[in-house]
Regions:
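Bacterial N-terminal signal peptides that target proteins for export
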Residues: 2-11
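Bacterial N-terminal signal peptides
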Residues: 11-21
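Electrostatic cytochrome c docking/interface patches
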Residues: 21-37, 117-129
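His/Cys-centered metal/cofactor-coordination and adjacent catalytic loops
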Residues: 23-30, 43-70
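Sequence context surrounding c-type heme c attachment/ligation sites in exported
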Residues: 32-43, 75-79, 90
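The canonical Cys-X-X-Cys-His
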Residues: 34-48, 108-112, 129
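Short, hydrophobic secondary-structure boundary micro-motifs
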Residues: 53-54, 93-96, 121
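Extracytoplasmic electron-transfer domains, predominantly the class I c-type cytochrome c fold
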Residues: 59-115
Length: 129
């Protein structure tokens, strides 16, 4: 069996994403919770689609990170959770470790990962059959 070009591209994409299963993972039960946290705490800077184009973005220097970029997608969950918890020095990204409990940080991370997978703004997954 010789893998097709689309099979090879899918494998390359999965490997680029660090093998995290981001593209194949099903929406978790934390989706709604993570989405609510994102709307409340993240959307103003990172925007509805995670591109870093929220309503506050034009006023921030440096601009907010693009959460759906290849560079962000390649980061491990641990790296992203560290950024959520500790913030980013010399940016407007605050530390959330004393604001959000660990399970909320994990839920928002799962929601951010879903933005890459679905590539659509703040829409819940379609209802099952």
């Amino acid at each position: 069996y010789l893998p097709s070009m689309s099979d090879r591209l899918l494998l390359a994409l999965l490997l680029t994403c660090g093998g995290t299963g981001v593209l194949l993972a099903q929406p978790s039960e934390n989706f709604d919770h993570g989405q609510a946290i994102y709307r409340e705490h993240c959307m103003e800077c990172h925007g509805t689609t995670g591109k870093g184009d929220g309503v506050k973005a034009p006023f921030l220097s440096p601009r907010p990170g693009n959460l759906i970029s290849a560079a962000t997608s390649a980061k491990t969950d641990q790296e992203l959770l560290r950024t959520i918890a500790q913030g980013k020095p010399r940016t407007a990204m605050p530390a959330w470790q004393n604001v959000l409990p660990a399970e909320d940080q994990q839920a928002v991370l799962q929601y951010i990962r879903s933005l890459v997978r679905f590539a659509r703004p703040l829409a819940p997954p379609p209802p099952g059959p």
